[in-house]
């Protein structure tokens, strides 16, 4: 694999402030060297296993050690390749020794084999990728007996049809591509099958879903766009890659136009989706764009996005005093882990340092960094594939996503809501509630029905109705859900999605969002209730943004406000009525401190629209009585909404009858 050319850590920014300082290549190398040096004491005597401290992962210590080796090998490989093998002898020797020991079945350091545990298939792909990337300095210098053992270790990937049909198809493909390049066993039929499966993930505008579910998350960037670009440069991929290079480049280019608008001015990625403990792996797609040479996003902006993301985590304590990554977001927060996570899992973050594989004279290092879109102006865009409205505000640097199409499920599913996917809103400044209550009883950024026993409905399986930006500069999105109660089956493994179980319908809910800047006007209607479900026994609950840290809260008169040190969440009934409240969740998410969530309860009146105003801002504009004024008229053509926003701007929005009409309730 080759990429052609075309010390110190700078001061960190204040939280929420635009990250104006830049990093030079030496700063990136200093960080990489620091991380690699910190990992070294946790290597086994033969260097084949890197077992970081902490509780044993969900798959056992042997897998933990392999994962620690493979994921730090990614970082070491980028470092070696970028240095062209010069001045990195210790890294070359350390990881070459680990490969020799790990592939030796008689070694106490031996790796878990691909047939012994599925996780070995994931880590084998990283090993194969880096062996290709560093071929002149590691592979070509390995003794022939060790090379034969490597081939033997990777061989089980050929003919194995148990790889899940998600991003894992790239693990089989990368391994077989490397084997092909060294004269090892491989199957062109299987390689083409994996490429075809990947193409089936494509949903439009450069977006892909990680499998058949509506699983839109950071894997789009750090896996589904990263692997095609790196794979195409592997020695064994040339003929297969050539026929798809232009198409893959176009998809990456289009995706990155959206991706740069999803990063907050402080460098925080969106706190949404599974595997968040991989942290600054979210920077990887921007380096991929630089490697591929995308035409629409400049190298300066790509590098600037990557810098802001990685620096955000460095500045906020992602590396502990030993220089190690732990399970968490900023600092440690073990509950962020999925069932597949172990102490070495966070080192998938190594992908965020992919740029150091590019040589010092690559243009990405020689031109100035450029600001993010949200640092230059307010932004508003609709992304149809995930059903997202994206609103970034320059005044406070926050990027918000209003979500009507992503749930890690399929339309019509009746699983529970995953708080990582199915909430109505995510942002770069907030976390969803992720404790047990967040999985069992959706509250933050949710619209639910609550029965007399306090049981809360879920909306997963909803139908996306529309997502667009209209001519008034208002983002419009809507969805319709069969609200349902779920009793989850016991013993399920956490892979980030909702829980399966016995479900019972409550009724159909339609929700529309009108979005401008930090504000959302949320329209909600109960279209009808299921047989045996009585309106009098229910409450319609509307939840707002959760605020982390020391927060003060007020609730009353149809208004709930939560104010933290530098963030305010406001929820207000537009037409009056409703009971306002707040709920504190002491250990609800990975940001510092507990969470406080504002909410409004309304009586259930099927067929009637309920209008709610929400605001999330570091510089709040709305005040009591001046939050938002809206007139909602319904006629045979649909809904017409005349809205006076807190900044004095008036807009007019129409929702057509096909979107706005009540559902025909059937169960």
Short names for language-model regions:
Residues 62-66, 70-80, 88, 92-287:
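Aromatic-lined, polymer-binding surfaces characteristic
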Residues 43, 76, 103, 135, ...:
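Structural signal for hydrophobic packing residues in well-ordered secondary-structure cores
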Residues 81-85, 139-140, 361-362, 532-535:
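Short, solvent-exposed secondary-structure capping/transition elements
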Residues 2-67, 93-98:
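Low-complexity, Ser/Thr/Pro/Gly-enriched N-terminal "stalk/linker" regions
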Residues 243, 274, 298-305, 362-369, ...:
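Composition- and surface-driven signal marking solvent-exposed, interaction-prone regions
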Residues 433, 438-667:
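Extended repeat-based interaction scaffolds and adjacent low-complexity, acidic/S/T/P-biased segments
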Residues 106-111, 264-271, 276-411:
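Carbohydrate-active enzyme catalytic cores, enriched for enzymes
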Residues 373-374, 378-468, 482:
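Low-complexity, glycine/alanine/valine/leucine- and proline-rich hydrophobic stretches
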